[in-house]
Swiss-Prot record:
Hancockiamide D displays potent cytotoxic activity against murine myeloma NS-1 cells, suggesting a potential antitumour application. More interestingly, hancockiamide C, the likely end metabolite of the hkm pathway, shows potent Arabidopsis thaliana seed anti-germination activity, but is inactive against the monocot Eragrostis tef seed, suggesting that it could be a herbicidal lead targeting monocots. The herbicidal activity of hancockiamide C could be due to its phenylpropanoid-like structural features, which may act on the plant lignan pathways, and hence warrants further investigations. PANTHER family: FAMILY REGULATORY PROTEIN, PUTATIVE (AFU_ORTHOLOGUE AFUA_3G14730)-RELATED (PTHR31896), TRICHOTHECENE 3-O-ACETYLTRANSFERASE (PTHR31896:SF64). Keywords: Acyltransferase, Transferase. This is O-acetyltransferase hkm3. O-acetyltransferase; part of the gene cluster that mediates the biosynthesis of hancockiamides, an unusual new family of N-cinnamoylated piperazines. The NRPS hkm10 and the NmrA-like reductase hkm9 are proposed to convert two molecules of L-Phe to the intermediary piperazine called xenocockiamide A. Xenocockiamide A is then converted to hancockiamide D via a series of hydroxylations and O-methylations. It catalyses: hancockiamide A + acetyl-CoA = hancockiamide B + CoA + H(+); hancockiamide G + acetyl-CoA = hancockiamide C + CoA + H(+). The keyword Cell inner membrane does not apply. Pfam families: Transferase. Its EC number is 2.3.1.-.
C-alpha cells in the first residue's frame, strides 16, 4: 500500500498515556520456517492491507499540532510527506541468510560463548529504520517482510508514542486471524468494531489531565516548528543483548516457599522481576544526594488496562502502561544475596523482595493511574521527570500469546519471537512471551559487555539459568550455529 491509496481518517490528538513515553520506535520480529518462503509474501501483504483498511490510523504519521504547542497529533499521510519509496509494508529479500536451527533457542546450554563477537546493529537489517529517522513526520507503524533462504522474518516497527507492547501483540493476533482466513477474504471478528473501540478509548483517556492543559495558554505555532521536545533516546551500538532461560521449576518453587513462609502473595512474574533486580543491583546502583548508602532503583512497566474503572478494553492498541519506581538500599538487595549461604536463604530473600513489588502493584487502582498520567499533559513533560533514569527496568510480555497463534496453512505458527534492540538502553530487561511447550522464563537483557559478564557470574543468577545466548534472529545460510 502506497501513500496514494492510504485509507483516510479523522486526525486526533495523543493522550496523556501516550505522552508518558518519548518519541521512539519499538520493534519485534516473528519468524516463520517455510519450504517456499515466497508463498508467504502475499499472505502477509494482504493481511496488512486488511488490518490497515479497518484501522486506517495505522497508516498515519505523528506530527506536532499546528495550533497547540506541545501537543502531538496523528494525521493521514498525504502523498509526498514521507515519500512513495516508504511503503506501509516493505519486502526485503535476504537469500544469503537463514533462520537459526530449531535447537538454538529451545536448548541453548548454560555456556555463553563469551569469546564470541556480537554486533547489536547486525539484526537491524530486518527493520524499516527509515521510519525512525524521519525529521518531522513520524509514521505510526511500518512492517517489513524479510525473505530468507528457509523462511520469513516479519517485522513490526511501531512508534511507541502511539502503540505500546500490548498493542503490538494485538496487531499480531489480528495478523494471524487475517492470514488463517481462507484466501484472506472471510470475516475477521478481531477487526469488527476495532476503529470505534479505539476512538472511544482515546476519548476517555483524553479527559485525563484536561484541566491541567486548559490552565496553560499557548500561542498557535507552525507545525513544522513544533518539534517534540522530549528526551532524545540514543541507540548505543556498544551494548550487548542476551537471552536467558530461567528454570520454571525453580521460579515456581520460590513462589511456593514464599507462601509457606507467610510472605505476602506474589506472582511468578513478581518473582522473576525480583530476581533481575536483586542480581543486577550488585553492579547497577547509585548514591542519593547527601547519602552514603547506595541504592538501586527498579522501573517496572505495568499494563493498566484493567486497573481503570471501567476497564480499558484488553485489545486497545494505544498506550496504557505506567512506570512504577521502587528503590531499595543495595544492602537489602545484593547485600542480602551475598549473605545468603543456602538455597533456603535465596528462596526467602527473593520472596521478600517480590512481596515488596506485589504490595506496590496492589496499590495501583483507577485513581492512582489517573493521578500518575495527569503529569503528562504535553509531549515534553516526559523529559522533566526522572522516571527514565532507573538502574534496572523490567517489562513483561509473558502473557502475550504469540506462540499459540495460527497463521494459516501457508505460514503455520511462529517459531521465534524477538524484540529488536534498537534504542534499547542500558539496564533494560524484557520478560518474553511463554512458549507452548517449554515453560522456561525467557528474559532478554541489555547491558554493557562488562556488566553482562558480571550478571552471568552472579551466584543467584547462575542457580536459576538453564540456557543463554546472544540475541540471534538469523544466521548466514552457510553457518552452523553452536552454543559452546
Amino acid at each position: 500500500m502506497t501513500k496514494l491509496d492510504s485509507p483516510q481518517f479523522e486526525p486526533f490528538e495523543l493522550t496523556a498515556a501516550d505522552y508518558a513515553f518519548p518519541m521512539f520506535y519499538a520493534g519485534c520480529t516473528l519468524s516463520f520456517r517455510l519450504k517456499s518462503p515466497e508463498m508467504g509474501i502475499p499472505v502477509l501483504q494482504t493481511a496488512v492491507e486488511r488490518i490497515t483498511a479497518h484501522l486506517p490510523f495505522l497508516t498515519g504519521i505523528v506530527i506536532p499540532s499546528a495550533v497547540k504547542d506541545g501537543v502531538m497529533e496523528v494525521h493521514p499521510a498525504a502523498c509526498g510527506q514521507s515519500g512513495l519509496e516508504d511503503p506501509q509494508c516493505r519486502v526485503r529479500r535476504l537469500p544469503h541468510l537463514c533462520l537459526p536451527p530449531k535447537t538454538a533457542s529451545a536448548s541453548a546450554n548454560k555456556k555463553h560463548g563469551s569469546g564470541m563477537t556480537y554486533d547489536r546493529n547486525e539484526c537491524l537489517i530486518v527493520a524499516p529504520l527509515e521510519a525512525a529517522t524521519a525529521a518531522q513526520q513520524h509514521p505510526v507503524i511500518r512492517f517489513q517482510i524479510n525473505v530468507l533462504a528457509d523462511g520469513i522474518i516479519f517485522t513490526l516497527f511501531a512508534n511507541h508514542m502511539v502503540i505500546d507492547g500490548t498493542g503490538l501483540g494485538i496487531i499480531t493476533e489480528m495478523l494471524a486471524s487475517c492470514c488463517q482466513t481462507a484466501d484472506n477474504t472471510g470475516s475477521v471478528p478481531e477487526l469488527a468494531g476495532a476503529i470505534d473501540r479505539e476512538a472511544r478509548t482515546r476519548a476517555m483517556l483524553g479527559t485525563i489531565g484536561r484541566r491541567e492543559r486548559e490552565k496553560v495558554q499557548f500561542e498557535p505555532v507552525a507545525a513544522e516548528s513544533a518539534a517534540p521536545d522530549g528526551h532524545q533516546e540514543v541507540h548505543d551500538a556498544s551494548l550487548v543483548d542476551c537471552n536467558f532461560r530461567l528454570s520454571a521449576d525453580k521460579i515456581r518453587r520460590i513462589r511456593e516457599r514464599a507462601q509457606e513462609l507467610g510472605i505476602a502473595s506474589a506472582s511468578e512474574d513478581d518473582i522473576v522481576t525480583a530476581v533481575l533486580w536483586l542480581c543486577m543491583s550488585e553492579f547497577r546502583s547509585h548514591s542519593g544526594a547527601g547519602k552514603e548508602i547506595s541504592a538501586c532503583t527498579l522501573l517496572r512497566m505495568v499494563n493498566v488496562r484493567r486497573r481503570f474503572h471501567p476497564a480499558v478494553p484488553d485489545n486497545y492498541l494505544g498506550n496504557c502502561y505506567i512506570m512504577i519506581e521502587e528503590t531499595l538500599p543495595t544492602t537489602d538487595l545484593s547485600g542480602g544475596a551475598a549473605q545468603a549461604s543456602t538455597e533456603e536463604d535465596f528462596l526467602r530473600l527473593i520472596g521478600v523482595v517480590a512481596s515488596v513489588l506485589r504490595s506496590r502493584l496492589n496499590r495501583v487502582d483507577d485513581q492512582y493511574v489517573r493521578d500518575h498520567l495527569a503529569q503528562f499533559t504535553h509531549a515534553g513533560d516526559w523529559a522533566h521527570t526522572t522516571i527514565h533514569e532507573p538502574d534496572v527496568a523490567v517489562t513483561s510480555l509473558r502473557g502475550m500469546s504469540v506462540y499459540s497463534l495460527d497463521f494459516g496453512s501457508v505460514l503455520s505458527g511462529i517459531v521465534d519471537f524477538e524484540t529488536l534492540p534498537y534504542m534499547n538502553p542500558d539496564g533494560v530487561c524484557t520478560i518474553k512471551p511463554r512458549r507452548v511447550i517449554d515453560p522456561s522464563w525467557e528474559v532478554a537483557v541489555t547491558l554493557s559487555r562488562e556488566d553482562m559478564d558480571r550478571l552471568r557470574k552472579n551466584e543467584l543468577f547462575r542457580w536459576l539459568v538453564v540456557g543463554e545466548s546472544y540475541l540471534h534472529i538469523f544466521q548466514s545460510a552457510q553457518q552452523v550455529t553452536t552454543f559452546a
